[in-house]
Amino acid sequence: MLIVLSPAKALDFAQPPVQAPLTAPQMTEDTSELAKVARKLTARDLSRLMSLSESLAKLNRERFQAFDPVSEEGLQAAFAFNGDVYQGLRARELDRKALAWAQDHVRILSGLYGVLRPLDAIQPYRLEMGVRLKTKRGSTLYDFWGEKVSLALNEAAQGHKDRTLVNCASGEYFGAVDRRALKLPVVSCRFLEEKDGQARIISFYAKRARGLLARYAIDNRIERAADLKGFDAAGYRFAPELSTDEEFTFARPQPPPPAASRNKED
């Protein structure tokens, strides 16, 4: 079983380092090619491509200017990303054995790196998968990555007892998975909040729940997708009446709204 997550827009490179292995991303040639394109973009270009404020556009232009795709330095991806998914995952709390299991069973989709393992070293960047960035391979990042993301996922699942790909990524990022090239069965997960007799998806809660589900799989060393039905963190329960073989649905009573001070950039 292999779980795929989206990255986060919010990054945290300021926390004290965690004593954990640092591995090299596996698609460095592609990342180098993309970085060359991104390095030519102005702050205005970045603002237009990703709807960034002037200050964020300048920051990310500086990041691309400093970006070194072959550097052996960086921070582990699971520790660097700081959005809602990663608040649920809480990777910094994992011990070495749990991190080793996650390294084999979790993948993070990335506009710049393609496919990341949790302990792969990344540098600060922002390049959303859905941007229309022209390269030699096409006019979007979906064109750029083509079959490569799917091929990397196929390889990552080799040797697993259950080769199911558990989709806990957003539609934007899972769109980079070419289903024709993917040789794995896919199960998607959705998370519903129930209130006043209605059930709906609320983005913030759904993102957090994806991280919680990945953490549940890591803590319990889940090897079969079907065993994820036991997920019960934060009040969620598997809802068989709302689920299919291709989509697992989890539901719970909707909690009170989160604090207004929460970091909105994910």
UniProtKB/Swiss-Prot annotation:
A GO cellular component entry from the record: cytosol
Family annotation (InterPro entries): YaaA
Biological processes, Gene Ontology terms: response to hydroperoxide
One Pfam family this sequence matches: H2O2_YaaD
Top-rank lineage group of the source organism: Bacteria
Region of interest called Disordered, as start-end residue ranges on this chain: 245-266
Family named by the database record: Belongs to the UPF0246 family.
Name used for this protein in its record: UPF0246 protein PHZ_c0561
Organism: Phenylobacterium zucineum (strain HLK1)
